[in-house]
Structures are given as C-alpha cells and as structure tokens.
Amino acid sequence: NQFSWETPFYLLSGLGALCFFAACFLPDFKGHIVEKNLQPKPVALLRSMWDDKNQRLALTMGLFLILGHFSTIPFITPFMTRNIGFSQEQITYIYLLGGGFTVFTSPLFGRLTDRFSALKVFQVLILISFAVTLLLTSLETASIALALTLNTLFFVFVSGRMIPAQTLMTSAVGPSGRGSFMSIKSSMQQLAAAIASLVGGLIIVELPSGELENYGWVGVFAVLISGVTLFIAPKLKVAPGN
C-alpha cells in the first residue's frame, strides 16, 4: 500500500534475475540425457506421452487440480472487500498470513510425504482443503479475525496438497522424459488457470450494491473439479527408473 502498483512486478523481475544468476552455479545433471541424434522429435514426444496411460493420467490430474485451484483464487480479494468488509490495508494481511504460514507448513507436508505415502498425504490434505474452500466461499458475514483464519487455512491446505500431488505426478514419468513432461504439464496448467478464472467469472454476479453473489457456487465447482483427482491419484504408477 506504500508503493505503486508496478512495485510487485519490479520485485518479481529482480528475484528472477537473482534466480538466473544462482542457476549459473548449479551443477549439470546430464546423466539421463540421450544422444542428440537419438532424441525423439517434438511430435513423436507428444504422441509418446499421450500413448502412455500413466503420463496421460498425471497430466489430467494436474489439469483438474489447477482448474479447482484457480477458480476461487482471483476473487478472494474482491469478495473480502465487497462482501466481508476488508479495507485495502487489511487485504495485505490475507497474503502476509497465508504466505507466512505456508513457509512453515510446506516443509512439514514435504516431510509427511516422505515419511508416509504421497497418496495418503494427498488424500488427507485435499479433503481438508475441500472443507476450508466451502467454508471460505460461503461466508456471508464474518469478523475480520475469522475471515483471516479461513483465508490462512485455505492458503495452507490448497497449496499444501500440491506437494504430494507433484510427487505423484513427477514419479509417473522416468528421468529421461521428465523435462519434456514438466514442460507440457506447465503449459496445460497455465491453460487450466485461464479457463478456471473464466468459469469463475461467469458464475459470479456483481449486485447493484457492489457485492459479489454466487461465490459459494464457485467453491462447489472447485471442490467437484478437484475431487476428480481423488479417483485419478490411486491409478498413478511409479515409472521405471524412479
């Protein structure tokens, strides 16, 4: 609130430059790379991914997770300001608390994923995230403290479920094809984020008073779409070489 709207973009650019500089000092990981003349063509690579049921399921799982994730996120700020009564200054605390707690909970979820199976941790976290999502999006009147608590829990569990999910999805492809797989997965997730935002915008209605209506239905949509992954995750298998 103390700087212009361009400040976050300058910050991201600066952090990106630092990451690029740091990447120059990372060791090379080339053991899995085949000779250049043996590498498949892009079209053949896409076809092999599609023909591999395991990779196809992993890509579908990532798609549905992001569809559910991003249908609600773009509307948190306007919903909190217009419906709950947050000031612009108080909006800062949503992301401060949500991001702050995630810094501590993400490593915890990572350790749980390593200690127990990724599937079990994913199933528990996604079910908790469903409850939090429905509670948050169905708020009508709430104190600032309650709304901040639900927002923080939303950030913790919605982002936390991605940790075991990533483990499940990346293990579905062998080391030699993982880079290509991750590129396709990232592209599909960007597309899913755009579609989810569009769908959320079509469901939500702005009342003459300025309040947003039907955000609760967006929450239901998010839960139903994300719920598909509960049926996909158990079918994923660890690819040879992992």
Features from the language model and the residues they span:
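Residue-level signature of mid-helix packing/kink "hotspots" within the transmembrane helices
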Residues: 99-107, 194
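Helix-to-loop junctions at the C-terminal end of transmembrane segments
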Residues: 105-117, 204
